[in-house]
Amino acid sequence: MSAGRPGPNVGGELSLATFNTHLGVDGWGRPYDVVAACRSLDADVLVLQESWAPDGSPSLARRVADDLGYDLVEEPLGQGRLLGPDPGADDRWGPSLGPLSTILHVDDDPRWRQRRSGARRSGGRHGSWGLAVLVRVPARFLGVTRLRPLRRDPVRRLVLSWEVPVGNGVLTVHGTHVSHLLQGSPVHYRELSRALAPGGRPAVLAGDMNLWGPAVSLQLPGWRRVVRGRTWPATRPHSQLDHVLVSGFVTGSGAVLGPLGSDHRPVRAELVVDDAPPGGAAGGTTAPGTTAPGGGGHGTAR
């Protein structure tokens, strides 16, 4: 870890936040300050979804890590062209609560290419977007668990896992961004249930699950919801799509926070790792489909 960052969590507590950044823009394509938004979360661990990286430039997650002093692992999930701000924008967050296709054209997806011909504006910048997990406390990156491609989802899906010493134990931290239900997410939930089977060890799973809380609980037995509250759409939320789940000897509390510029509200939790019996700490064993550090060179850790 770099000098000046917080040391080990000797008190047995860890703060974590998950935030879907919506590529760092509102529904009209107008940028907001993602670094300031993440600074306000003040979390030891940040799970960021839809982190935009223009070709040849640092990603939003990298900028957050560099400015706020985090270590970072990130993986691209898709590529496309992010359009510039809509000249017809008004004071609303966006023109609708529709898909990202209003501001983003996804590569290798015929449905989105068809929409391109009728787009209200052109131009923009090509790049990629993905998932990132950032830590500002001592930690060890465990690997990447890749989920199988779904025919109706043009975006890759995966899990990034870290091991964080907390108090006298070790907490395994998983960050993810799951497909939408209409794209076949139950397939991925079955994979997650097998690959991340709790087994009694302290762990947390956080991210945009694209699914309501009760359904998430049914899909992931053994995981408990820490925060309950509506997260989407950020302006007038009616559903909770963003979750923090724990298993093993972990308790916690938290809240859904106010809007920070995205269409999702962030979720922040304070987690406590209780003393576990001998042998109950999480180990470094990787799950099936997992790339260990250095095994594929896809994640970047400083």
Feature-to-residue mapping (PLM):
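Second-shell loop/turn segments in exported
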Residues: E50
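Active-site phosphate/pyrophosphate- and oxyanion-stabilizing loops and adjacent acidic/basic residues
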Residues: R62
